[in-house]
Amino acid sequence: MGTSFGRGGATTFQQDLQYSDCILIMGSNMAENHPVGFQWVMEARERGAQVIHVDPRFTRTSATATKWVGIRAGSDIAFLGGIVNYILEHERWFDEYVKRYTNAPVVINEKYEDTEVLDGFFSGWDPDEGRYGEYDITTWAYKGTKAQTAPNSKASLTRGEQSGHGGHGGGLSHGEPPEEDKTLQHPRCVFQILKRHFARYTPELVAEACGCTPEEFVAVAEALCANSGRERTSSIVYAVGWTQHTVGVQIIRTAAIIQLLLGNVGRPGGGVMALRGHASIQGSTDLATLFNILPGYLSMPQSYSEGGLEHYIESAKSPGGWWGNADAFIVSLLKAWWGAAATKENDFCFDYLPKIDEDHSEYWTFVQMLDSKVKGYIAVGENPAVGSANSKAHRLGLAKLDWLVVRDLVEIESASYWYDSPEIESGELRTEEIPTEVFFLPASSHVEKDGTFTNTQRLVQWHHKAVEPKGDCRSDLWFYYHLGLKIRERLKDSRDPKDRPVLDLTWHYPTQGEHDDPSAEAVLAEMNGWDEKGGALSDYKPLKADGSTASGCWLYAGVYADGVNQSARRKPRWEQDYVAAEWAWAWPMNRRILYNRASADPDGRPWSERKRYVWWDGEQKQWTGKDVPDFDLQKPPDYDPPDDAKGPDAIRGDHPFIMQADGQGWLYVPQGLLDGPLPTHYEPHESPFKNPLYSQNANPRRQQFHRPEDPANSPEGYPYVVTTYRLTEHHTAGGMSRTVPYLSELQPAMFCEVHPDLARERGLAHGGWATIRTARAAIEARVLVTDRIKPIRSNGRVVHQVGLPYHWGSRGLTKGGSANDLAHMTLDPNVHIQEVKALTCDIRPGRHAR
């Protein structure tokens, strides 16, 4: 979504779903995995909305929907691409919205060639470039422009932050867009390229690729079209069922294209609702737990890039849009971290930041571990021995470390692999031969510490400590703060320049209690930041690049406005409207719907009274409405920037997407993605089917490691499709739930879902045992024979699907095989996410012979 709209966060909030006229849920079992938010889907259904669930499995979400369509795991782009084609073929797009608010009229340069011409490749493909083959993205550019932020002419491995939870499409050179055709007839304008690209995604091809019927597909496409436009809006909801593919980012891109064509972005009851994988996954990415970003989705400096802060700013800034203020964002971050030590003379300590070269993702780190190139590892809030694809390879990697620190609530599999794991049981690993020194440090749960969750709708909510942690349990904040103090104490007499980044850090947070717990509120206040007088910032607009302001995360500026913890606000719903602006705080600037300038027409009037949300008040000369306007408050709809305008001032008054360089929603992405400017259907890395569109079967840019510990399935030996999923009763890798008696009683055993026809074909008995195999591993599971997971008919044959929850491991009150043992380490190239929603397997009756 970042490359499509300008920010990677959900465009809307869950309460707004109640005002949708149609809700399409794909890649999510929302009723079971996000049950609190699902109440608003049920509210919409009671108001007459159509609720459609498209998924390989029939779940509780399907049961409460008005329509369920079963599809093959891994065929999402084929289905969504069919909707794009349906919109274009039947002329159902929102014409004024598309022409005025998107890059549909923009003309693309002559070098661009489509996958329809190059049989599954975009122009610029070089199979010998880089580790996996790379695209020369300059061939995708707007006519007369060049990429602004790309570090070189190729698509760099580390640029995927543009497509993540908060990334953006990057800058464009001055003068954009250089050429437009508002009639949308130019053969190289984005609109015509889009039509040609998706022309083959007919209902018949969708049915062939996905395993549904043409009639089922048309019913979904028509429902979205009929419930979009001036008077009506539709929403699309997804979760990790879309992200965990080698084309995960491009699946989400296809949904963004649909919503832009239908005019649903920035409007009440519309948008794209990204349901995150746990309570604060949005917050963890906002604050940069990913290797390639800094807080607020600023890019990490590159090791091969020279020129210091000036060159970094030059590559990060966009001539138009709010990323034109990237210099203020990065300098304010540096001031928050290094305070008085950060001066203009020393580039505000920019050189203190680590520089990255290529890939430092979790999977590449473990590949290096397997080669004994990693000496130590700290695992916090992570259980790679169960939760990562090809968990066996991860356990083998851990066994080659010199030391390992695991911080968790209980002793999870990543802490016990050296004496209790499938490899210990089989003899592949021997405890006495493992050199790793393992430290297990008990952590505090969220009820034992103050802090925040930033949830699926960018809502930062404060949680208060309810009880003191027991024994040696400590919060992660306590751990890192006191670890920092000890390191600084060790280095206090150092004169080595490499130690200055640690010694110069602002590390003076107030502490409290017998264990000297640092104040979480003080950290939140630092994220918010201060102005030149030391006053708390009210938002990010006052940030400056001269060193007079500080902010630990520019997106969070305003969360501590007026020196008050805004995330702790709890005004009851009956005392405010449904937007609930005084319940907690949402980034940025407490906006609940992003791009809400698009809820008004180009002249600033609501598209309809029924969908009135934000509009231009001609008398007051400002934008107003039910939410914080996502636009410059005093910029009129007819504002036309002068030629020398920069940053936000370069965005027209009728261009709502203020984080994009041109202020437009991007149907076509000229830069920011590694695998193509448009989504296209590729088969999963492992698939029993041939690509119905191209001879190129899988995403050519997918990230592969070609390791002996990660062999690929042969097509003939593994005839079935596996998809993994979550249960309501267990949480992620199971460390927090398999140790809880009543949750373990509710879901007491690892199981596999199979259709009755597959059970007969393989001799599987309901309640009996089955062994599921891939080339990586084999696990055993109890058999659940059910009609809920349908076989797929494609290419004239039937292929069965097997459903596996992934919560089990060797520890806890309930133990079982880990579904991730079966998976391969093949990743989406943009965000390095594993493909565990679609792979192949074999299944046989009986227990796994060890």
What are these regions (language model features)?
Residues 1-36, 40, 47-49, 153, ...:
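Extended redox/cofactor-interaction regions of prokaryotic respiratory oxidoreductases
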Residues 54-60, 409-412:
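Short, polar loop motifs at secondary-structure junctions
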Residues 62-228, 318, 486:
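Long, well-ordered, tryptophan-enriched scaffold segments
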Residues 63-71, 417, 425-426, 442, ...:
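Short beta-alpha connecting loops at secondary-structure transitions
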Residues 100-103, 223-224, 239-241, 271-282, ...:
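A glycine-rich phosphate-binding loop feature that marks nucleotide/adenosyl-phosphate handling sites
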Residues 205-212, 238-246, 275-279, 382-386, ...:
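Conserved short loop/turn motifs at secondary-structure junctions
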Residues 436-469, 480, 668, 785, ...:
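Glycine/threonine-rich phosphate-binding loop and adjacent beta-strand/alpha-helix elements that clamp
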Residues 478-533, 624-627, 632-634, 639-650, ...:
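Long, contiguous, secondary-structure-rich segments that constitute the structural scaffold
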